[in-house]
């Protein structure tokens, strides 16, 4: 297994992996090829894919606003899970964010995503007592359930 920086050329394979991963929370704007291109241009050194025999089996998007890091869409192909691939992708993302001077990382997970919540909790991500996450859509977004 090899981990490398994600390229826009990986989009079709990565998107297919996301579609086949439960609880991803995709949408037609941010997760379109144009949306991912914009994200990769802004965060060229913090997004990674895992490959096995030249096939993408895992992915993580991460980036920052200069103060805090965010991790999005960590996914590993179902048949490749429980082998440390998710951990390795997360470690690469966190090290890349540290390298850019980021000291705190956030992740957003759906409440009903039990497997996802267990994964993040096991890795030290906590639900902060002092804050509430709020969101407002400022464009018409079509959500894609996985």
Description of each model-found segment:
Residues 37-49, 70:
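A short helix-loop-beta-strand connector motif used in the catalytic cores of GNAT acetyltransferases and
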Residues 49, 55-63, 70-75:
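Conserved beta-strand in the GNAT
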Residues 63-72, 81, 127-131:
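A conserved beta-turn-beta hairpin within the catalytic core of GNAT-like acetyltransferases
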Residues 74-81, 109-110:
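A short, internal acetyl-CoA/4′-phosphopantetheine-binding micro-motif in the GNAT/acyltransferase core
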Residues 82-95, 122:
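Conserved acetyl-CoA-binding loop-helix of GNAT-fold acetyltransferases
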Residues 107-116, 135:
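Conserved beta-strand-loop-alpha-helix junction that forms the acyl-donor binding cleft
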